C-alpha cells in the first residue's frame, strides 16, 4: 500500500514539473487561463475578409483582448492603441 502512495506522489510531481509551470499562489486562475489562451496563438498569417486588404493572424480560440476579428476563420488583427 505504501509503494502505491509513493507512486502517486512521484507521478503527480513528474506531471507538475514536466508541464513546465506550477501555479503560484499570487496568481489567479483567470490570469493563468488568459496566459494559456495567449500562448495558443498560431504563427500563420491570414487575409482579412472585411475588404480592408489587411493581413491578420490565426488564433485557435477567439481573438484575445486587444485584438479584433476581421473576418475569415478566426483571423484577428491587433487593434490600434
Curated annotation (Swiss-Prot):
Disulfide bonds: 46-75, 48-70, 63-76
Tissue: Expressed in ectodermal gland cells. In adult female tissues, highly transcribed in mesenteries (gametes-producing tissue) and slightly transcribed in tentacles, pharynx and physa.
MF terms (GO), sorted A to Z: toxin activity
Keywords associated with the record: Disulfide bond, Neurotoxin, Signal, Toxin
Coiled coil: none
Stretch forming the signal peptide: 1-20
Other comment: Negative results: does not show activity on all ion channel tested at 10 uM (hNav1.1/SCN1A, rNav1.2/SCN2A, rNav1.3/SCN3A, rNav1.4/SCN4A, hNav1.5/SCN5A, mNav1.6/SCN8A, rNav1.8/SCN10A, BgNav1, Shaker IR, rKv1.1/KCNA1, rKv1.2/KCNA2, hKv1.3/KCNA3, rKv1.4/KCNA4, rKv1.5/KCNA5, rKv1.6/KCNA6, rKv2.1/KCNB1, hKv3.1/KCNC1, rKv4.3/KCND3, hKv7.2/KCNQ2, hKv7.3/KCNQ3, hKv10.1/KCNH1/EAG1, hKv11.1/KCNH2/ERG1).
Function: Has toxic effects on zebrafish larvae. It causes contractile paralysis and twitching of the tail within 30 minutes, followed by death within 40 minutes. Does not show any toxicity when injected into arthropods (cherry shrimps or grass shrimps).
Annotated protein name in UniProt: N.vectensis toxin 4
Organism the protein comes from: Nematostella vectensis (Starlet sea anemone)
Amino acid at each position: 500500500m505504501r509503494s502505491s502512495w509513493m507512486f502517486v506522489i512521484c507521478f503527480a510531481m513528474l506531471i507538475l514539473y514536466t508541464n513546465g509551470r506550477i501555479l503560484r499562489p499570487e496568481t489567479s486562475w483567470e490570469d493563468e487561463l488568459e496566459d494559456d489562451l495567449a500562448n495558443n496563438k498560431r504563427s500563420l498569417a491570414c487575409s482579412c475578409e472585411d475588404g480592408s486588404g489587411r493581413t491578420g493572424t490565426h488564433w485557435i480560440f477567439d481573438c484575445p483582448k486587444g485584438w479584433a476579428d476581421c473576418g475569415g476563420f478566426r483571423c484577428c488583427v491587433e487593434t490600434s492603441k
